[in-house]
Amino acid sequence: MILGLGMDVVEVARIERILAGPPARVDRFLERCFTARERAYCDAARDRATRYAARFAAKEAASKALGAPAGIRFTDVEVVRGAGAPVLELAGVAATAAARLGVRRVLVTLTHDGGVAAATVVLDGEEAR
């Protein structure tokens, strides 16, 4: 049963502008929004801004799917590489909200084209009673 659905779109140029900013501001943004694993994955790529944009979109989409729970942090939602497909790992407030909803599986898809990155998140499970 689908318990939640979220979608978000991010302009890659917006992330490029942030990454081109003063180093202290860039570091604050990256540490606030992305886990160490996400930063390592994105920083290893030529298309760094595109990878960050897709992951940012996934975090926003997950928050929407969860009902935008109070206190959720960007790092509560982590995009990791699965066996050929991205996987979302939830922690903190995101994990608590998912458990409360009865979520058993989190599905995510990422895409990018034409200067935008997008993500869709589907929460699957049995409705909590």
UniProtKB/Swiss-Prot annotation:
Enzyme class: transferase
Compartments, as annotated in UniProt: Cytoplasm
Family of this protein: Belongs to the P-Pant transferase superfamily. AcpS family.
One Pfam family cited in the UniProt record for this chain: ACPS
Keyword ATP-binding: no
Catalytic activity reported: apo-[ACP] + CoA = holo-[ACP] + adenosine 3',5'-bisphosphate + H(+)
Organism from which the protein derives: Anaeromyxobacter sp. (strain Fw109-5)
Gene Ontology CC: one annotated term: cytoplasm
Swiss-Prot/TrEMBL GO biological process terms: fatty acid biosynthetic process
Stored SUPFAM superfamilies: 4'-phosphopantetheinyl transferase
Cofactors: Mg(2+)
Chain positions recorded as Mg(2+) binding sites: 8, 60
Function, as annotated: Transfers the 4'-phosphopantetheine moiety from coenzyme A to a Ser of acyl-carrier-protein.
Sample GO molecular function, one term: holo-[acyl-carrier-protein] synthase activity
EC number: 2.7.8.7
Top-level taxon: Bacteria
Keywords tagged on the record: Cytoplasm, Fatty acid biosynthesis, Fatty acid metabolism, Lipid biosynthesis, Lipid metabolism, Magnesium, Metal-binding, Transferase
Name of the protein: Holo-[acyl-carrier-protein] synthase
Gene3D superfamilies: 4'-phosphopantetheinyl transferase domain (3.90.470.20)
Top-level taxonomy: Bacteria, Pseudomonadati, Myxococcota, Myxococcia, Myxococcales
